[in-house]
Amino acid sequence: MSSTQFDHVTVIKKSNVYFGGACISHTVQFEDGTKKTLGVILPTEQPLTFETHVPERMEIISGECRVKIADSNESELFRAGQSFYVPGNSVFKIETDEVLDYVCHLEG
């Protein structure tokens, strides 16, 4: 089971706001220089498309979502406690019918 908190971190106060507020996150920096973002995605009528620059592991904390990675024709369902991986320099589409809490682990 994963931890419910991060210790010994720096939180960047300014939020990252995407898609007119449908996705809001904050960046967390660790002592070793690694970063994660903690965020919320609100329900939308259409999937949200994100571009990655570094590999990302998206950990779902609460809610559920449907995700298409890169050129996949199939969406996959992810629920709280699950994660999905997106390669660097790629795209993914995500949609949810409920509030989705996530941690994005920036792995590059």
UniProtKB/Swiss-Prot annotation:
The lineage of its organism: Bacteria, Pseudomonadati, Pseudomonadota, Gammaproteobacteria, Moraxellales. It is an enzyme of class 2 (transferase). Belongs to the nucleoside phosphorylase PpnP family. This is Pyrimidine/purine nucleoside phosphorylase. It comes from Acinetobacter baumannii (strain ATCC 17978 / DSM 105126 / CIP 53.77 / LMG 1025 / NCDC KC755 / 5377). The keyword Oxidoreductase does not apply. GO terms for molecular function: guanosine phosphorylase activity; purine-nucleoside phosphorylase activity; thymidine phosphorylase activity; uridine phosphorylase activity. Catalyzes the phosphorolysis of diverse nucleosides, yielding D-ribose 1-phosphate and the respective free bases. Can use uridine, adenosine, guanosine, cytidine, thymidine, inosine and xanthosine as substrates. Also catalyzes the reverse reactions. GO terms for cellular component: cytosol. Gene3D superfamilies: Jelly Rolls (2.60.120.10). Keywords: Glycosyltransferase, Transferase. It catalyses: a purine D-ribonucleoside + phosphate = a purine nucleobase + alpha-D-ribose 1-phosphate; adenosine + phosphate = alpha-D-ribose 1-phosphate + adenine; cytidine + phosphate = cytosine + alpha-D-ribose 1-phosphate; guanosine + phosphate = alpha-D-ribose 1-phosphate + guanine. InterPro entries: Ppnp, RmlC-like_jellyroll, RmlC_Cupin_sf. The gene is ppnP. Its EC number is 2.4.2.1, 2.4.2.2. It holds the Pfam family Ppnp. PANTHER family: PYRIMIDINE/PURINE NUCLEOSIDE PHOSPHORYLASE, PYRIMIDINE_PURINE NUCLEOSIDE PHOSPHORYLASE.
